[in-house]
């Protein structure tokens, strides 16, 4: 018998899973946190472009345009459009007031 199989056999009995039917609150909390973390990570990877663009550009409101001539409003809207519109194969929904 080689030394490798002896070591594997020896450690295998020492690392048995003892938490199959465990009702320890710490084990349950760790499992729930792990599952939630996995779900949030998957959602983040699927929708990261939408989420971060919305946070970066969607929540910012521009300055008030009251009393500003129409030509300057259009220029501001065009600048805002060019700042948000990124050509990477995805469409960006922009709602103009």
UniProtKB/Swiss-Prot annotation:
Pfam hit, one: Flu_M2
Residue positions bearing lipid (S-palmitoyl cysteine): 50
Topology Intravirion: residue spans: 44-97
Entry GO MF terms: monoatomic ion channel activity; proton transmembrane transporter activity
Ranges in the topological domain labelled Virion surface: 1-22
Site entry: Essential for channel activity, possibly by being protonated during channel activation, and by forming the channel gate and the selective filter: 37
Region of interest: Disordered: 60-84
Site feature Seems to be involved in pH gating, where: 41
Keyword Transmembrane helix: yes
Activity control, per UniProt: The M2 protein from most influenza A strains is inhibited by amantadine and rimantadine, resulting in viral uncoating incapacity. Emergence of amantadine-resistant variants is usually rapid.
Entry-linked InterPro entries: Flu_M2
Transmembrane segments: 23-43
GO cellular component, one term: host cell plasma membrane
Modified residues (Phosphoserine): 64, 82
Domain of life (superkingdom): Viruses
Subunit structure: Homotetramer; composed of two disulfide-linked dimers held together by non-covalent interactions. May interact with matrix protein 1.
Family listed: Belongs to the influenza viruses matrix protein M2 family.
Note: When the channel is activated, one or more imidazole moieties of His-37 probably become bi-protonated.
Protein name (database record): Matrix protein 2
Annotated organism of origin: Influenza A virus (strain A/Gull/Minnesota/945/1980 H13N6)
Taxonomy of the source species: Viruses, Riboviria, Orthornavirae, Negarnaviricota, Polyploviricotina
Gene it is expressed from: M
């Amino acid at each position: 018998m080689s030394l490798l199989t002896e070591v594997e056999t020896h450690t295998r009995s020492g690392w048995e899973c003892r938490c199959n039917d465990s009702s320890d609150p710490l084990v349950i909390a760790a499992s729930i946190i792990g599952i939630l973390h996995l779900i949030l990570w998957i959602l983040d990877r699927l929708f990261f472009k939408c989420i971060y663009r919305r946070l970066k550009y969607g929540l910012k409101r521009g300055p008030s345009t009251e009393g500003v001539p129409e030509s300057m409003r259009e220029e501001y809207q065009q600048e805002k459009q060019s700042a948000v519109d990124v050509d990477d194969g995805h469409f960006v929904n922009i709602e103009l007031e």
